[in-house]
Design a protein with these regions (language model features):
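Transmembrane helix boundary and interhelical loop/hinge segments in multi-pass membrane proteins
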Residues: 91-97, 256-261
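Predominantly cytoplasmic-facing regulatory/coupling regions of multi-pass membrane proteins
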Residues: 1-78, 136-246, 279-280, 285-317
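Interfacial segments of multi-pass membrane proteins
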Residues: 100-107, 259-274
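Transmembrane alpha-helix interface/packing and boundary motifs in multi-pass membrane proteins
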Residues: 83-88, 238-254, 258
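Membrane-interface alpha-helices at helix entry/exit sites of multi-pass transporters
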Residues: 72-75, 93-94, 106-119, 270-281
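Short intracellular "coupling" helices and adjacent cytoplasmic loop segments at the cytosolic face
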Residues: 78-95, 102
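Membrane-embedded alpha-helical segments of transport systems
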Residues: 83-87, 112-134, 277-292
């Protein structure tokens, strides 16, 4: 019953987003926008976008303390992206953890902690960029919850770091085994392993990843589509669309990402046809290479969606 309700909610979200993105669209004008795209710029921007995936692989290798190797970590990252693009649920992180466990013989706790730090710093990057956008455009109502979100997360980590006994008591009360195992590993790392240099270097890796991601959006909007939005507004569009991409919805966030882009660019006076054309282009730049390469890794590894589902269920017991 719970799965059915979850599916219906996601289906409703996707349907609403698709209706929002395409409702009232003049397809003739939309096609004219597409025809005006700079073909050479599309090629260069597509190649440039791959740098973000390379950076993400380097960051993942750093999180393994340079034990797994850049190639395995790049494959793991692309696999997770590819699985998220085709699977009906957000199984990408599970596939990444499963791949690292298989290739590197890591424990469940270690792979969960690696994925936790990766996603946690991505969340921090997204929240901090959201705060910056809220300040630049004087949207105080958005700034307050975003800032509160960042501070509360770090507050919890501070509690774990400086009050380990209390933190362990809380972890022991968590009813979900997989979450309890992951939190226990995070606690152990905070108390005995990670330190300020670890956080600073991980922050630099994360900043590098997101700067490269943002660069793709800037090139697509300003160079490929010839839309004269200033840099701060393009970055605001990037942040809002990234939130849409992160929402649990359809495989690959199809529909949700496009709606987020149309909404964000509409805030700055960009017409729906131009906004949707850029959204579809950017989405294909993200979708095609990650799906093709990710599925190649998937098939080469002998992995199946059933194995990933089984790994998820075993971890949650």
């Amino acid at each position: 019953m719970k799965k059915a309700v979850n599916f219906l909610l996601r289906l409703g979200l996707v349907a609403g987003c698709l209706a929002y993105a395409f409702w009232g669209l003049n397809f003739q004008e939309f096609w004219q926008v597409v025809l005006r795209f700079n073909g050479w710029a599309i090629v260069v921007t597509s190649l440039y976008s791959l740098l973000g995936y390379v950076a993400a692989g380097l960051r993942l290798n750093y999180l393994t303390r340079f034990d797994a190797g850049n190639r395995i970590c790049f494959d793991a990252y692309m696999l997770s992206m590819g699985v998220n693009n085709i699977a009906p649920a957000k199984l990408g992180e599970v596939s990444k953890a499963f791949f690292l466990r298989t290739k590197c013989k890591y424990s469940l706790a270690r792979t969960l902690s690696i994925v936790f730090w990766e996603r946690f710093f991505d969340l921090n990057a997204l929240l901090l960029m959201g705060c910056a956008v809220a300040v630049i455009f004087k949207v105080q109502l958005a700034f307050v919850p975003l800032a509160a979100g960042v501070l509360s997360i770090w507050g919890v980590l501070g509690l774990i770091k400086y009050f380990p006994a209390t933190a362990q008591w809380i972890v022991d009360k968590v009813p979900v085994a997989r979450l309890r195992t992951g939190l226990g590993q995070v606690r152990e790392q905070l108390v005995h392993g990670v330190n300020l240099p670890f956080f600073l270097l991980l922050g630099l890796y994360t900043a590098g990843c997101w700067l490269l991601y943002a660069g793709t959006a800037v090139l697509a909007v300003n160079w490929v589509a010839h839309i004269p939005l200033p840099l701060d507004k393009v970055l605001a569009v990037f942040v809002i669309s990234s939130v849409g991409m992160a929402l649990p919805s359809s495989p690959g966030a199809m529909g949700v990402y496009e709606a987020a882009m149309v909404f964000a660019m509409g805030l700055f006076g960009v017409d729906k046809g131009s906004a949707l054309a850029v959204a579809l282009l950017l989405h294909m730049m993200m979708f095609v290479p990650t799906t093709v390469y990710g599925m190649w890794v998937f098939l080469k590894s002998g992995m199946t969606l059933k194995k990933i589902h089984d790994a998820e269920e075993q971890g949650g017991q």
